[in-house]
A protein has these predicted regions:
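Extreme N-terminal starter segment of soluble prokaryotic enzymes
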Residues: 1-5
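Polybasic, low-complexity association/targeting segments
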Residues: 6-11
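Conserved mixed alpha/beta catalytic, RNA-binding, or beta-rich assembly cores of soluble enzyme
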Residues: 12-18, 25, 34-36, 44-99, ...
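Conserved beta-strand termini and adjacent loop/short-helix elements that scaffold enzyme active sites
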Residues: 30-33, 116-118, 264-266, 307
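Donor nucleotide-activated moiety binding/catalytic core segment of transferases
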Residues: 41
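C-terminal non-catalytic interaction/assembly regions of soluble proteins
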Residues: 237, 241-296, 300-306, 310-314
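Extended alpha-helical regions
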Residues: 303-334
Length: 334
């Protein structure tokens, strides 16, 4: 986690420097070196994973207020008094990791962590915190409150997952008899009214004609996601045949999504075990009967999720890496 610390006094600066030994990050003091509260906050809110104010909570609240957008994207914000007595997460307690950070900082300086999120205060399962620990994206953040609200009301919430989850479900959580009955679900292809948690384990296999533009690939990818219900946030990498390694459109498409892209030879793709959609035409052009499916499986080291999908001269497939979710996500439970 990339932290940024801001202090307001010499005493606060000393504490910030101490804390940065535990949770590394930049340390600044307001009023020194041209640092202003508004300027520092604007810069770090966009760049850092966590903002740590060593000073009054009111100052921190007023500083971050103009920048708050969404619990899905806002950084963690924690405030400590300059004496190191209390550590209070103010923003993104679960998804941003502010609760965990406050506890770590408190342990480093002997402070009391002041955790105010309702599930934590009541000792209940926090679905968004668990999702973060499992490397899952929350697909519909407004639905978090329905799961948490049910638990707070003493109800049992049901989950569905195609992957086995290690450990014992927390109190108030049980497996749904049918996936359609789940209150929250682990899936790459969200459908229905549940809260969907998307594992970031997907690899996109790509096949395309020479000269295919990034815009064409983007349009085809949008159609692929729509027609298969694939959540694009679950894709973290792309793969293709080495004949495409210098295709500007493909490289730009992957770069725009922040995906690393790997390229394999026809021989490497032919060696991938499994049953794939075969094409004589593709075999004649590339030396292997299928590019997108084989490339996705090879790069993922896992299994095929979505078979070949063709759209305007582009083919896509999706595979998933091995995934092992665990109910024992807290450090003291592992």
């Amino acid at each position: 986690m990339n932290c940024a610390y801001l202090a307001f006094t010499a005493k606060g600066l000393a504490l910030a420097q101490q804390l940065a030994q535990t949770c590394p990050g930049s340390v600044s003091r307001c009023g020194l070196g041209g640092v202003t509260l508004a300027g520092w906050t604007a810069q770090q809110f966009a760049a850092a994973d966590a903002l740590v104010f060593v000073g009054a909570a009111g100052i921190a609240v007023r500083a971050i207020a103009p920048h708050c957008q969404s619990k899905a994207t806002d950084p963690a914000v924690v405030v400590l008094d300059e004496c190191g007595r209390f550590a209070v997460p103010l923003l993104s307690g679960h998804l941003g990791g502010a609760n965990d950070l406050a506890c770590r900082l408190a342990a480093a300086c002997g402070a009391v962590p002041v955790i105010t999120t309702a599930t934590d205060a009541n000792g209940l399962f926090a679905v968004d915190e668990w999702a973060k620990k499992q490397n899952c994206a929350v697909w519909e953040t407004p639905r978090i409150k329905f799961v948490s609200g049910a638990l707070l009301a003493g109800k049992t919430v049901r989950y569905a997952s195609p992957w086995a989850i290690a450990g014992t479900p927390p109190a108030g959580v049980a497996e749904a008899e049918e996936p359609s009955d789940a209150d929250f679900a682990l899936t790459m292809t969200p459908q229905g009214n549940a809260l969907h948690l998307i594992p970031r384990i997907g690899v996109l296999g790509v096949g395309c004609k020479r000269g295919t533009t990034a815009a064409q690939l983007e349009a085809a990818f949008a159609a692929f996601c729509t027609d298969t219900n694939l959540a694009p946030v679950g894709i973290t990498a792309a793969a293709s045949i080495d004949l495409k390694q210098n295709e500007p459109g493909l490289l730009e498409f992957c770069r725009s999504h922040g995906w690393p892209v790997s390229f394999s030879s026809a021989a490497q793709l032919r060696a991938v075990p499994g049953t794939f959609s075969a094409s004589r035409f593709v075999q004649g052009v590339t030396g292997v009967d299928n590019v997108c499916e084989r490339a996705a499986v090879l790069a993922s080291g896992g299994t095929l999720l979505l078979p070949k999908y063709a759209h305007t001269g582009v083919t896509f497939a999706a595979a998933v890496r091995p995934f092992a979710p665990d109910w024992r996500w807290k450090t003291d439970e592992a």
